[in-house]
Amino acid sequence: MAQLCVALVAGEASGDILGSGLMRALKARHPDVRFIGVGGPLMEAEGLQSYFPMERLAVMGLVEVLGRLRELLKRRKLLIQTLIEEKPDVFIGIDAPDFTLNIELKLRQAGIKTVHYVSPSVWAWRQKRVLKIREGCDLMLTLLPFEARFYEEQGVPVRFVGHPLADTIPLEADRPAARAALGLGEGPVVALMPGSRGGEVGRLGALFLDAAERLCQQVPGVRFVLPCANATRRAQIEQMLEGRQLPLTLLDGQSHQALAACDAVLIASGTATLEALLYKRPMVVAYRLAPLTFWILKRLVKSPYVSLPNLLAQRELVPELLQDDATSEALANTLAPLVRDGSQQTERFDEIHRTLRRDASNQAAEAVLALLKDR
């Protein structure tokens, strides 16, 4: 079995997790493999020779990107030159599409096989990016089934590999154990998850707390848990709690424990909605953006839904209350019946979980090696 050289580039922590799982699965099938590129500590632990620290690519927000644009473009140009000289058997760009899609295009033009792992949201907005993907990508690996259908329609070779979260989150969470670990009793528990970024928490935090106060009047004995992404978010929430008498427990991280312990969730639109679905917890999804941003996105976004549960179900499975519709009264009134019985949501959640549970890393490794079998 000839040695395989695999180049990978991941730009953030979630990509490092995906990349390390894929590397492990590739080594199990093809032990003589060398890994080069850019990744984090998990990928380096699996044997990646990383050309520079992944943190140099982990930039969020338009202002931050503009501030580092020259460095990012210089690093990408150098990376393309290095990889063309190295001639790996395959290049795998993991998420980070604004950085990796251009690399894939240049390497494919140089005769190197290219794979993109994790689809950008081209099905929702900036759909013309699919033209660049079709030109630069030999294979797209998607985590979600509706993404694969979109690429098939667009003539892009694709494989739906499943979602790693669906592999790691159990089909049935142990609610009593999670409650015991968090010191919660028998009564109804609602998780409040207003997001992990400062702007999100600034727009949704007080709104969620107002809704919780209203919910106390509708659901006797209800308690709340709110997982804080970091110390800064915790301080932000603590400031919002001043003068309130809510039966609320703040958690440091522990979002999965909060989801396992609760009966229902009030949640910001984002990846956390998929986690809530996988824990089979009924939810109400809310989101608020700056008015101008919302106005622009409303005209750009092609999808009728914003939350992953509804995109996966292809219908309004969970209530979405956006912008002016997201009032504390509406949130509490919509959530109260779900605390008592959310089975209409959770039965479909179970079906979706089983669809997504496909052993993603091994599926991805098989797809990559199948692409290379004629090399």
Swiss-Prot record:
State if Ribonucleoprotein is listed as a keyword: no
Q: Which GO terms describe its molecular function?
A: lipid-A-disaccharide synthase activity; phospholipid binding
Q: What EC number(s) are associated with this protein in UniProt?
A: 2.4.1.182
Keyword annotations for this protein?
A: Glycosyltransferase, Lipid A biosynthesis, Lipid biosynthesis, Lipid metabolism, Transferase
- Enzyme kind, highest EC tier: transferase
Coiled-coil annotation reads none
Give an example GO cellular component term for this record.
membrane
Q: Identify the metabolic or biological route this protein is part of.
A: Bacterial outer membrane biogenesis; LPS lipid A biosynthesis
Superkingdom per UniProt:
Bacteria
The answer, when asked if Hydrolase is one of the entry's keywords, is no
One Gene Ontology term from the biological process aspect of the record: lipid A biosynthetic process
The record, for Pfam families, names: LpxB
Write down the chemical reaction(s) this protein catalyses. a lipid X + a UDP-2-N,3-O-bis[(3R)-3-hydroxyacyl]-alpha-D-glucosamine = a lipid A disaccharide + UDP + H(+)
Q: Where is the signal peptide?
A: none
State the protein's purpose: Condensation of UDP-2,3-diacylglucosamine and 2,3-diacylglucosamine-1-phosphate to form lipid A disaccharide, a precursor of lipid A, a phosphorylated glycolipid that anchors the lipopolysaccharide to the outer membrane of the cell.
Record family assignment: Belongs to the LpxB family.
Matching HAMAP family: LpxB
According to UniProt, the name of this protein is Lipid-A-disaccharide synthase
